[in-house]
Amino acid sequence: RANQVWALDTTYIPMARGFVYLTAVVDVASRRVLAHKVAITLEAVHAKEVIEQAFTRYGVPEIVNTDQGSQFTAEEFTEVVLAKGCRLSMDGRGAWRDNVFVERLWRSVKYERVYLKAYDSVSAARADIADYLSWYNAHRSHSSLERLTPNEKYLAALPPMAQAA
């Protein structure tokens, strides 16, 4: 069901000169991107901000899954998750398959958008990635979701009470 398990990860986004970091929160049941942030540093504060954004918009899941990246093992991040009463699940070190839903998102983001561009500024990367993720949620159907989009699957996977609200 929606909002039961959320997965977080961070990836590098190449630019014309250098790179930025993209962190996202994905609802595992629907593949919907609930929150994201493009930042110029890999710090726990960015992971904290993106999970807080998801909590504010969508409530609190039972489980938050991440890898063992320094931004996710930092107290600044773990305290926020645990204070909400979530169970924090961390993948085995180097075990990318454990977080396959976010890894698959990264493939889509990079091959369907990022690698076709050469962002010349952080603001251009932020705007274009936000545009892509909005499109991804609303229009990118998935064979694993019975050809539904993440938004369609998310709404269908909400508990009945949440749908009525």
Predicted regions and their residues:
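Charged DNA-binding/catalytic regions of mobile-element recombinases
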Residues: 1-165
